[in-house]
């Protein structure tokens, strides 16, 4: 059996491709928004209901998806959810009203809720602790790549055929990836092409809570009663509205505020997502650099990245001070970079403080918190954008991220959740 050096990087590349296609299906509706609103006579508020349907379903399914992944395993669980979102995305082409779009997008959101927990679980299986933020940065970059390629692909499909074809193409690509995932993904213990040296490197570099597979799983109640959970969940609640806004509203923002046509949207709407890619990658490399430069531990280094991203989010918060559309695009690029840098750090923190047997569940619960905020903010945008404009809403997003940075420094302790639970003596977590 031929051994492949550096196989963990091939695995994270496969995870990244899944994230790319998942976010392509997610952002197809945003890129097609001007056409959908015109052809189906959809108002801004009705469009917000479509976005909220996706976000609400994603919110509710986050902990469910995490639990299913922990029970079925990364390979089977992720494949099942990917097939579902592919089918539901293609079925969106059958919608003939905003209500039909909302139902279809809600189904897509429910299935795509597994995407980030699955990526995080795969990263915790395949990477030692010191490289995990890099791995998460790479698979998280897929979210912005998918969002980046959606505008030109969707505009091409609309011009060449119809908006329905855009959803069919996106769904078909995700289905093909799901089949590839079933074929190629394996846990390191089952991967025969993995060298002994790399297997030892992965296992020996993981924290104790990730090395032991026979440990009892923390219950949902124990996770919710742990302050470490809230130290991650609250900042994610405050940060996620920004990413939801970037994914769902930028094309419509360009159309309504600056009068961009479909061609101009295809030319510029992807740019903030390119910078979001850079934020994902750089945000993954910063924690080990901060550890080396400042002598801090892993959790503190993640907090520093979150803080840096929150400060940079002041950029898009000032978008209302400028009338030039190209300055606005530049500020959105800064925001894309900032959010994805801090988002990667927040997501990775779940695998830093929770054990392998509950990491997907914990991430699903923190994700539920994040997407609840995204759902609510989408409704706020739909209700207020046509009256007060988009600028005050971008300012609010900047304030949210700064508050999230404050919370993470005051609530999250610099130790695993198991240690925090044992110190409280109220509800001791199971020993790992």
From Swiss-Prot:
Annotated catalysed reactions: aldehydo-D-glucuronate(in) + H(+)(in) = aldehydo-D-glucuronate(out) + H(+)(out); aldehydo-D-galacturonate(out) + H(+)(out) = aldehydo-D-galacturonate(in) + H(+)(in); D-glucose(out) + H(+)(out) = D-glucose(in) + H(+)(in)
GO molecular function: hexuronate transmembrane transporter activity
Periplasmic face of the membrane: 33-48, 97-99, 160-164, 258-264, 315-317, 391
N-terminal signal peptide: 1-31
Keywords from the named record: Cell inner membrane, Cell membrane, Membrane, Signal, Transmembrane, Transmembrane helix, Transport
Cytoplasmic side stretches: 70-75, 121-138, 186-236, 286-293, 339-369, 413-432
UniProt name for this protein: Hexuronate transporter
Family as reported in the entry's similarity comment: Belongs to the major facilitator superfamily. Phthalate permease family.
Organism placement in taxonomy: Bacteria, Pseudomonadati, Pseudomonadota, Gammaproteobacteria, Enterobacterales
């Amino acid at each position: 059996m031929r051994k492949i050096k550096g196989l963990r990087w091939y695995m994270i590349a496969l995870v990244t491709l899944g994230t790319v296609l998942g976010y392509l299906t997610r952002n197809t509706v945003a890129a097609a928004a001007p056409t959908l609103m015109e052809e189906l006579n959809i108002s801004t508020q009705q469009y917000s209901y479509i976005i909220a349907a996706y976000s609400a379903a994603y919110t509710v399914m986050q902990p469910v998806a995490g639990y299913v992944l922990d029970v079925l395993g990364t390979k089977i669980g992720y494949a099942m959810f990917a097939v579902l979102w592919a089918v539901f995305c293609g079925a969106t082409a059958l919608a003939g009203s905003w209500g039909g779009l909302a139902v279809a997008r809600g189904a897509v959101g429910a299935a795509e809720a597994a995407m980030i927990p699955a990526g995080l679980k795969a990263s915790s299986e395949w990477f030692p602790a010191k490289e995990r933020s890099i791995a998460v940065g790479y698979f998280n970059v897929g979210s912005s790549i998918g969002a980046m390629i959606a505008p030109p692909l969707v505009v091409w499909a609309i011009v060449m055929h119809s908006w329905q074809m855009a959803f069919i193409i996106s769904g078909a690509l995700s289905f093909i990836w799901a089949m590839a995932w079933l074929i190629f993904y394996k846990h390191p213990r089952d991967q025969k092409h993995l060298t002994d040296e790399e297997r030892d490197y992965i296992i020996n570099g993981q924290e104790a809570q990730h090395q032991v597979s026979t440990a009892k799983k923390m219950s949902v109640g124990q996770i919710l009663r742990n302050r470490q959970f809230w130290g991650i969940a609250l900042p994610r609640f405050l940060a996620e509205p920004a990413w939801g806004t970037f994914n769902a509203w930028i094309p419509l923002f360009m159309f309504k505020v600056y009068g961009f046509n479909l061609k101009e949207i295809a030319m510029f709407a992807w740019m903030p997502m390119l910078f979001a890619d850079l934020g994902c990658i750089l945000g993954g490399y910063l924690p080990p650099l901060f550890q080396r430069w400042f002598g801090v531990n892993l959790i503190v280094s993640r907090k520093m990245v979150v803080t840096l991203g929150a400060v940079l989010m002041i950029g898009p918060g000032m978008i209302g001070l400028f009338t030039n559309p190209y300055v606005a695009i530049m500020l959105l690029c800064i925001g894309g970079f900032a959010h994805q840098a801090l988002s990667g750090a927040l997501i990775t923190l779940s695998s830093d403080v929770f054990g392998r047997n509950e990491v997907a569940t914990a991430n699903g619960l923190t994700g539920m918190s994040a997407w609840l905020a995204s759902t609510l903010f989408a409704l706020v945008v739909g209700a207020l954008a046509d009256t007060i404009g988009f600028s005050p809403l971008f300012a609010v997003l900047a304030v949210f991220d700064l508050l999230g940075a404050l919370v993470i420094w005051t609530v999250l302790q610099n130790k695993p959740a198991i240690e925090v639970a044992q110190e409280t003596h109220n509800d001791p977590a199971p020993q790992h």
